[in-house]
Amino acid sequence: MDLSTYILSDTPLQINRMHMCTWDIKGCKAFVEFGFDFSVEASQKNEICLIVASSFISEADTTEDLYEQIVSKENLAFIFNDQYKGKKEVNHGPHSVGCDISFTIQKEMRFLPISKIETHNGYSKLIIKNWSTATSNYIRFCIDTNYDVLATIQHDITRTLHIYDVRINSLRNLPKFIESFLDNRMELCRKISKCYMLHAVPSEYIICHHEEGFKSLRIVEHEKFYAYLSKKRELKADENTIAFNKLQAQDGEYSFCTEFEHERVGTQQLLVAIGCNLLCSIFFAIGSILHPTQSGAPWYNNMPVLYWIAIVIIIGLIIYLVVCARKKK
């Protein structure tokens, strides 16, 4: 799965922090969270159009605004690792259009609901209103995909490898539909000061490769995440771990590669075990087979029919395993 992701906007944005978390867990389809802490200079526009584009997004997916969950006092402390200090509603007329939240350590931020969401093949389009120019602003949303897993998967006889190769705003292989956005008054958000990349996977997966930005691997706090994620997804105690990566870049272009592996007892493993067992049985009997008999008949005439059958099975297993190995290449 190509996880290259592009962030575009029709308004110049300073993205102070970008959060992206992939969830490949048991019991549900894969989903991805995005969070943006951004600042806006004075603008005459009434709304901002933000586009998150990636090949894993399709029009059949659901993009859910997580505003109601994120402004909960308990969830704020959990997600931002800081103590909630106070909240002030931002009202336009009788309706709340966001809230200004202060923390003990971090600066005050305005949390905004997403005014409009559209999900298309290859991208999600978000309309944001009522932002603050005095403080930074924050939105968070989740894309529920139709994929079982988002990782690139490679198999061998004893293990399965899950590769998460995520690139943000990579110009190396810019898709044509991104170029069409750039031709239509949109621009890549190149000012992304920090990027946080997280991957939630089943706990039996073992991290086997990571790059410079890797920070930690922890057990998912299932009760807190269960409440935070709308209680729509099954999260069981100690069943999932989450890998945390963090990088800073001047040009807004990021690259993260994290690999997990897990051992498995698959069909090929069982076939290898059967083949080894048959081969060992033949080796144990080879002395008596090669021992000359009184009739002087060749040794292969002394071999029981069952041994010939075992040899044919072993040859068949070798051919099968070689063919499987070539198909994977």
Language model: regions and residue ranges:
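Cytosolic-side membrane-insertion boundary helix
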Residues: A227-T293
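Short aromatic-acidic-glycine turn motif
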Residues: I57-L66, S203-H210, V220
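Low-complexity, intrinsically disordered segments enriched in Ser/Thr together with acidic residues
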Residues: R110-P113, I117-V149, L247-Q268
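Hydrophobic, helix-forming membrane-interacting segments
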Residues: R264-K329
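Surface-exposed, acidic/Ser/Thr-rich flexible loop segments
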Residues: G122-L217
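Beta-strand elements of well-folded, non-transmembrane domains
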Residues: F36-A42, S54-F56, I143-V149, V201-S203, ...
